[in-house]
From Swiss-Prot:
Originating species: Anopheles gambiae
One Gene Ontology cellular component: proton-transporting V-type ATPase, V1 domain
EC number: 7.1.2.2
Pfam families: ATP-synt_ab, ATP-synt_ab_N, ATP-synt_ab_Xtn, ATP-synt_VA_C
NCBIfam families (alphabetical): PRK04192.1 (NF003220), V-ATPase_V1_A (TIGR01042)
Stated role: Catalytic subunit of the V1 complex of vacuolar(H+)-ATPase (V-ATPase), a multisubunit enzyme composed of a peripheral complex (V1) that hydrolyzes ATP and a membrane integral complex (V0) that translocates protons. V-ATPase is responsible for acidifying and maintaining the pH of intracellular compartments and in some cell types, is targeted to the plasma membrane, where it is responsible for acidifying the extracellular environment.
Gene3D superfamilies xrefs: 2.40.30.20, 2.40.50.100, Bovine Mitochondrial F1-atpase, Atp Synthase Beta Chain, Chain D, domain 3 (1.10.1140.10), P-loop containing nucleotide triphosphate hydrolases (3.40.50.300)
Disulfide bonding pattern of the chain: none
Similarity comment text for this entry: Belongs to the ATPase alpha/beta chains family.
GO molecular function: ATP binding; ATP hydrolysis activity; proton-transporting ATPase activity, rotational mechanism
Coiled-coil residue spans: none
Subunit structure: V-ATPase is a heteromultimeric enzyme made up of two complexes: the ATP-hydrolytic V1 complex and the proton translocation V0 complex. The V1 complex consists of three catalytic AB heterodimers that form a heterohexamer, three peripheral stalks each consisting of EG heterodimers, one central rotor including subunits D and F, and the regulatory subunits C and H. The proton translocation complex V0 consists of the proton transport subunit a, a ring of proteolipid subunits c9c'', rotary subunit d, subunits e and f, and the accessory subunits VhaAC45 and ATP6AP2.
Activity control, per UniProt: ATP hydrolysis occurs at the interface between the nucleotide-binding domains of subunits A and B. ATP hydrolysis triggers a conformational change in the subunits D and F, which induces a shift of subunit d. The c-ring is subsequently rotated and results in a continuous proton translocation across the membrane.
Protein name: V-type proton ATPase catalytic subunit A
Amino acid sequence: MSNLKKISDEDRESKFGYVFAVSGPVVTAERMSGSAMYELVRVGYYELVGEIIRLEGDMATIQVYEETSGVTVGDPVLRTGKPLSVELGPGIMGSIFDGIQRPLKDINEMTSSIYIPKGINVPCLSRTQSWSFNPLNVKAGSHITGGDLYGIVHENTLVKHKLMVPPRAKGTVKYIAPSGNYTVDDVILETEFDGEISKFTMLQVWPVRQPRPVTEKLPANHPLLTGQRVLDSLFPCVQGGTTAIPGAFGCGKTVISQSLSKYSNSDVIVYVGCGERGNEMSEVLRDFPELSVEIDGVTESIMKRTALVANTSNMPVAAREASIYTGITLSEYFRDMGYNVSMMADSTSRWAEALREISGRLAEMPADSGYPAYLGARLASFYERAGRVKCLGNPEREGSVSIVGAVSPPGGDFSDPVTSATLGIVQVFWGLDKKLAQRKHFPSINWLISYSKYMRALEDFYDKNFPEFVPMRTKVKEILQEEEDLSEIVQLVGKASLAETDKITLEVAKLLKDDFLQQNSYSAYDRFCPFYKTVGMLKNMIGFYDMARHAVETTAQSENKITWNVIRDSMGQILYQLSSMKFKDPVKDGEPKIKADFDQLYEDMQQAFRNLED
């Protein structure tokens, strides 16, 4: 019996399969038994990157992330045995990747061409650049588990890159590198567990379709301040929240997501341009390095806290699907360091269209509008990776990932499957309105259809810091809603026949719309509105409304009636000051001066109404 061959002696099945059929980005290969779902493969003599998305018998269906022209039947398909993964380590911030994390700048320098050659094999993070590494209080002999911080790399002046033990590793430290300069390939930590020694470099590799583990999810209770008045006051989002911005073409989705990445109170921004125009990504590349943010009195370029994943509309379709996962995995990595990360996905509709195209090539059953039946599940699995969490390992830290997804429904129709599936998942809906955009009212957020489900979660924050804010916001919504109802009557019978209080409502609503909700992203004073300024402006506008109504209601029965016309004629100056509150520049004037000016205006208003009533 002993001379019989064992299976283990035989050569394992070969690492090669062969191309059987090609249909656009979808390639079928034979002799692929033993391969796994979502395994990375190299197709053809160019070694194009692909991923297995279906297995039947020994046939595998592969979606290829590059142009497949020139692939012929019988070409070899090399199995790598690894899933599609991203490299996580120093060097991510400030760089621009394509959908499968190939560094576009390095490729450009290497080939000196504006095109990405086929099957190019470039390391995602530079292997030659050295980073200055400082160990934290971890010594040889100390025990360490997944997620523990063991060192810091000052990636740039804005982002401290904290090095973590990979989530599934554990053991006793045998060696930790002293402070000094190392590349991402140098071993800086060795651990021993059960007699096995593991070596770690600054680089971690993580599969993109798998969420990174956390200790627990926490309730989100801190607002994501965007610097846009209409969003911060009426429809706030939280750090760790999910938001959708649906809107037709030309409504300003991209401007909103760019201003979020410029001015929001996040530590790290990941901007995924997914199937949108290439010019928008180049605009980001051109604008961001010039924009600065002030941290502890030092001005820094915003590009230092931003990573870009560019997958424009002329790049291969299949890579669009990967780009969203690449972006969210990069975000989760920085979240695990204890940062608040915002991820902008512009736009998830193009991602859904990529799913639809691949699904059509696979001859799957189409559902609504030809999208695959699993569209909702895929969207949910992406959005649910957002949230505020307690990170793995020591020291204890909290991080969050907020996702802002732009949706471009065809013809601005919000009943489109992608929009309706997204609205069933996200908690905040900033609906953009074509009519407002045509009236040049930007940001063109329709205050009647938009909503936020985080109001209750944020009440504690407002009570602690801005106690008068919540009742004012409720009143603003009431005024805007009333104005909508009155506008129909006005169109029928004209303004003159309205009650005096209704005239006040109309005028204050006009003031709110023109000078509070509207905001010019391209002006120095208004491109960013800090929250104290938002609250100050609201306080004065609502104060004016309350005082005017009070004056009209108390004198309605008496001899000298105060009507809206009387108020308007005698308070021209105050109305002018109310509508020019937005011109106060937070950078030049500073917080104390703006607050003092707003308080002064409030006192002037009270005095003016006292004089009027006397």
